[in-house]
UniProtKB/Swiss-Prot annotation:
Cofactors: Zn(2+)
Membrane-crossing residue ranges in chain numbering: none
GO biological process assignments: negative regulation of DNA-templated transcription
GO molecular function: ATP binding; DNA binding; zinc ion binding
Zinc finger (unnamed) stretch: 3-34
Function: Negatively regulates transcription of bacterial ribonucleotide reductase nrd genes and operons by binding to NrdR-boxes.
Keywords: ATP-binding, DNA-binding, Metal-binding, Nucleotide-binding, Repressor, Transcription, Transcription regulation, Zinc, Zinc-finger
The keyword Nuclease belongs to this UniProt entry's keyword annotation: no
Name by which UniProt lists this protein: Transcriptional repressor NrdR
Every ATP-cone domain range: 49-139
Length: 149
């Protein structure tokens, strides 16, 4: 790695530690030319599959879109942001685990509902009502009855 101070090519690693629950590595480095020290962070670059929408349009996976949809359903609900981030991380892991280059948006919606059901039943119903386009109160009741089973 190049030194950010003198741009020399040779640096050595002084210390390495796992951070972020083991998902990245923090390294302290020292330049062999100017002796300045600096910190770098290393994370695996994990490619997310592309999303195939119901109208066959393909678009890159958008984590912000996933997060905003979940947060909208969870609005004013007693769920911590850490729990939301863990759920998002779990969904992304499941999508990568498919090994597919493209996944249908329907799969993502189902994974979101699965996570919301674990986090907060009210948020799950909110999301399901929009995602499944509930038409009347009867459909809400049927979904709530399924939750109680």
């Amino acid at each position: 790695m190049h030194c950010p101070f003198c741009f020399a090519v040779d640096t050595k690693v002084i210390d390495s530690r796992l951070v972020g629950e083991g998902s990245s590595v923090r390294r302290r480095r020292q330049c062999l030319v100017c002796n300045e020290r600096f910190t770098t962070f290393e994370v695996a670059e994990l490619v997310m599959p592309r999303v195939v929408k119901s109208n066959d349009v393909r678009e890159p996976f958008n984590e912000e879109k996933l997060r905003s949809g979940m947060l909208r359903a969870l609005e004013k609900r007693p769920v911590s942001s850490d729990d939301v981030e863990m759920a998002i991380s779990h969904i992304k892991s499941q999508l990568r685990a498919t090994g597919e280059r493209e996944v249908p948006s329907k799969m993502i919606g189902n994974l979101v509902m699965e996570q919301l059901k674990k986090l907060d039943k009210v948020a799950y119903i909110r999301f399901a009502s929009v995602y499944r386009s509930f038409e009347d109160i009867k459909e809400f009741g049927e979904e709530i009855a399924r939750l109680e089973d």
